[in-house]
A protein has these predicted regions:
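Short glycine-enriched nucleophile-adjacent loop
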Residues: 215-227
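C-terminal motif of bacterial Sec signal peptides marking the signal peptidase cleavage site
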Residues: 18-21
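Active-site loop->helix "elbow" adjoining a glycine-rich segment at hydrolase catalytic centers
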Residues: 126, 180-184, 212-215
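Alpha/beta-hydrolase fold nucleophile elbow
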Residues: 199-211
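Substrate-access "cap/lid" subdomains that shape
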Residues: 91, 194, 228, 237-355, ...
């Protein structure tokens, strides 16, 4: 992934504008100019969509809550994605990361302050609370802004040890340190509230949405009093098993990190000068001590996450009492058929007997029961299907959905993506994250995931329409394209089943999921 950082300043004399009276406009050079609360920015126009990238929304010292960015003079050029939060991954060059300059967001809009109040959709990237960025091509907001006449926003924020290290034992100055990564997102939402009208958006109609870790962040925001009133609808995609830490565990982990570095709580200020890689090393050692050996394949920084401290974050998301501060928020939630499961679709000649032999290693004498329940849920199953179904995300989603409707009367919709990608000879199934390019209507930007079949484009058109309609009205129904999408109830489990033929299903897999992972 290649990111460009360009924070050049253009003098006012070149543009011939007065900062004090700068209304949104387009220069003779086709540069859209907007005055924000912190300064004037210029962007670009891409196929009729006004685009601003790398817009500063905050600044912060290490482990401190975010503050407003310093105001700037002149016009700040915002035409390239900003730096990425510090993280250790193989697919992002470290030169593209910056601990100080990561606090930026991106905006795509069809018009600037034209009197219309467009719905705003703010995307939170995946990667747990550990990795990721807002600059993934498949989450480019142009297609949604163009198709749905909405304002799209995406945001970078602090991650892993820099975003979620609990130093509360070191004094009141650090009492919020365990949650500063999420407070960054709250700060971005405040920026939206204060500025989005200049970009043609409605600050009173903001939908937050995200997948995987991004979905977990959506659920976390729903439990944060500071975020109350800053968003009005929410979409959680494959995010209901992203748990935060208890206050006791996060505090113990923070002290373990200090111990690894040979620093006492009284010497906490020394953390400000320790290189990031040394912090990560100490963090990994501390996680090992607190959690035990890292499971093979789990993220390096697995263990740093927000802390349910009862103040910044009231409780564990997706547990009883979930989102008591946002019971009035319309919500949409869903998963994919296979998620992160290793699939057997490449084994074209797999027989039912061979599949059953493997299943017996998992279910023993209950294997026939599993197959019977699977057949009830998916009558047209193949032997490969039996070995490939998600057994983690879907059960948690059903459990969360049941609790949500018991505790909230706000509209609540559930979806399930069963459509299998045609890439790699259809061997990947309906995998984790496949709903992202479909919901963004970005098949052309992620053909290595979706393929380029007519079915992929058709489904992307339908799903993106549903996401857009939900952002506009709180109702995802797409008249003439989908059967009626009813709100979820425990009794019927109404779920929109996205496939080559879309349909509304009713508790189609509840018994199967309860067998795999008891839903109570």
């Amino acid at each position: 992934m290649k990111l460009l950082t360009n924070l050049a300043f253009v003098t006012l004399s070149v543009i011939g504008l007065s900062i004090l009276g700068c209304n949104p406009k387009v220069t003779q050079n086709q540069e859209p100019i907007v005055k924000t609360t912190h300064g004037v920015i210029s962007g670009s126009i891409d196929d009729g969509i006004y685009t601003f990238k790398g817009v500063p929304y905050a600044q912060a010292e290490r482990f401190m809550p975010p503050q407003n960015p310093n105001a700037w003079e002149g016009i700040r050029e915002c035409v390239a994605y900003g730096p990425v939060a510090k993280q250790i991954v193989s697919w992002i060059d470290e030169s593209l990361m910056d601990e100080k300059e990561l606090f930026s967001l991106n905006v795509w809009t069809p018009a600037l302050a034209d009197g219309k109040k467009r719905p705003v959709m703010l995307w939170l990237h995946g990667g747990g609370f550990h990795v990721g960025s807002s600059s993934d091509p498949m989450t480019d907001g142009k297609a949604l802004a163009q198709k749905g006449d909405v304002v799209m926003v995406s945001v970078n924020h602090r991650l892993n040890i820099l975003g979620f290290l609990d130093l509360s034992a070191c004094g009141s100055k650090y009492e919020q340190s365990a949650n500063v990564g999420m407070l960054d997102v709250v700060k971005a939402l405040e920026w939206v509230r204060n500025n989005i009208e200049h970009f043609g958006g409605d600050p009173a109609n903001v939908t937050i949405f995200g997948e995987s870790g991004g979905g977990g962040k959506v659920g976390t925001l729903m439990c944060m009093p500071a975020a109350n009133g800053l968003f009005h609808k929410a979409i959680i995609q494959s995010g209901t098993l992203i748990n935060v830490m208890t206050k006791e565990k996060s505090a113990a982990l923070g002290l373990a990190v200090l111990d690894e570095l040979g620093i006492t709580p009284e010497e906490v200020e020394k953390l400000n000068t320790i290189p990031y890689h040394d912090l990560v090393k100490a963090g990994n050692e501390a996680i090992f001590k607190i959690n035990g050996p890292r499971a093979p394949g789990s993220p390096t920084m697995f263990g740093f996450a927000p802390s349910a401290d009862g103040e910044v974050l009231l409780q564990q998301p997706f547990s009883p009492g979930f989102a008591s501060v946002s019971n009035d928020i319309p919500l949409m939630m869903g998963t994919t058929l296979n998620e992160l499961m290793p699939t057997a679709y490449a084994e074209k000649d797999l027989t039912l007997e061979q599949a059953k032999a493997r299943l017996e290693k998992i279910y023993g004498g209950k294997t026939d029961t599993y197959i019977e329940l699977y057949a009830n849920a998916y009558p047209d199953f193949t032997p490969q299907d039996l070995l490939s179904i998600d057994t983690v995300f879907r059960p948690f989603t059903i459990r969360t959905a049941d609790a949500r409707v018991e505790e909230s009367s706000a509209p609540f919709y559930v979806y399930f993506l069963a459509w299998k990608s045609t890439v790699e000879e259809s061997t990947k199934g309906s995998f984790h994250g496949l709903d992202i390019p479909l919901a963004f209507n970005n098949v052309d930007l992620k053909p290595d995931w979706t393929g380029t079949s007519d079915a992929a484009y058709e489904l992307a058109d339908i799903m993106s329409s549903a996401w857009l309609n939900f952002a506009k009205t709180g109702n995802p129904n797409v008249e003439g394209r989908l059967p009626e999408w009813k709100t979820y109830t425990v009794e019927n489990g109404e779920t929109m089943y996205f496939d080559n033929e879309n349909r509304l299903v009713f508790n189609h897999d509840r018994d199967l999921m309860h067998f795999i992972k008891p839903l109570n």
